[in-house]
Amino acid sequence: MNESYRCQAATWVERGSSATMGGVAFSAGLLGNLLALVLLARSGLGSCRPGPLHPPPSVFYVLVCGLTVTDLLGKCLISPMVLAAYAQNRSLKELLPASGNQLCEAFAFLMSFFGLASTLQLLAMALECWLSLGHPFFYQRHITARRGVLVAPVAGAFSLAFCALPFAGFGKFVQYCPGTWCFIQMIHKKRSFSVIGFSVLYSSLMALLVLATVVCNLGAMSNLYAMHRRQRHHPRRCSRDRAQSGSDYRHGSPNPLEELDHFVLLALTTVLFTMCSLPLIYRAYYGAFKLVDRADGDSEDLQALRFLSVISIVDPWIFIIFRTSVFRMLFHKTFTRPLIYRNWCSHSWQTNMESTL
């Protein structure tokens, strides 16, 4: 049988493989997303009666809620199949022998679907952050929570249609080593256009989304840095402008500490998101345009798939849990207060010197 992948037709989990990493990833993802949902509920996101005590949810939190639900569904649908394969020492194709290759195809579809849907929602969040900071007038007029609710369904519908193309004959799903993963086939010995074409198309779309997300985050970081510099050089004028501006960035202008929070989190998000997405994009292009020895490439493909799955684990911790007041308090006590005190001492010393002169 002329197969492109060593474990393509395997019926058992490859020896030497352990379920430890899969179990840890599932536990971390499940805990993070459940904790994120609890924090979102406590923040008043689910309130149906806006008012002084229950302000309407911001667009950002609506988008975060959609991303959290998407990641949680992905973890609950995908990870149990991996753990079941390890527990029974059977590959995905053999977990349900009567279904043939359907379970493997369903797993691969879910992997590609949730990977694309989450990336689209991450781009929407990055775009929302950039618009709110760099184009506040356009943001206030056109970006609303009601429109933000549509992001998750629209991203899901697009991802559903796109990732279902292999079922229509364009693209192919295949089982990867150690027999507990299935995903888009990224190499074909006969260089079939229908197989390689979908792999390149999927990876190209992911690359464009990653690039757009990084650009938006860098733009938002640039705006935050400019705001922070203005606050340091003109603290009184900035405070007066904040008080007179009424409703500004997300129902209230951020103070300098919040600006620093956002800057650090955006930088961390950009680095982690890029690191987790690029391995899969690289493997897809590498398999499409170079002759690959599958005996040497299976481990790299598995690592790329694992990196992709890390995004859904990291998302809730970065976007929600690290934004809570408890984390901010610890962060400010550890890093921000010494920095502010040092800057204040330097500014006071400079002022005293100028007054004596």
Curated annotation (Swiss-Prot):
GO terms for biological process: adenosine metabolic process; cellular response to prostaglandin D stimulus; inflammatory response; male sex determination; mast cell degranulation; negative regulation of cytosolic calcium ion concentration; positive regulation of cytosolic calcium ion concentration; positive regulation of penile erection. Keywords: Cell membrane, Disulfide bond, G-protein coupled receptor, Glycoprotein, Mast cell degranulation, Membrane, Receptor, Transducer, Transmembrane, Transmembrane helix. It is found in: Cell membrane. It comes from the Eukaryota. It is a multi-pass membrane protein. One of its GO terms (molecular function) is prostaglandin J receptor activity. Receptor for prostaglandin D2 (PGD2). The activity of this receptor is mainly mediated by G(s) proteins that stimulate adenylate cyclase, resulting in an elevation of intracellular cAMP. A mobilization of calcium is also observed, but without formation of inositol 1,4,5-trisphosphate. Involved in PLA2G3-dependent maturation of mast cells. PLA2G3 is secreted by immature mast cells and acts on nearby fibroblasts upstream to PTDGS to synthesize PGD2, which in turn promotes mast cell maturation and degranulation via PTGDR. This is Prostaglandin D2 receptor. The gene is Ptgdr.
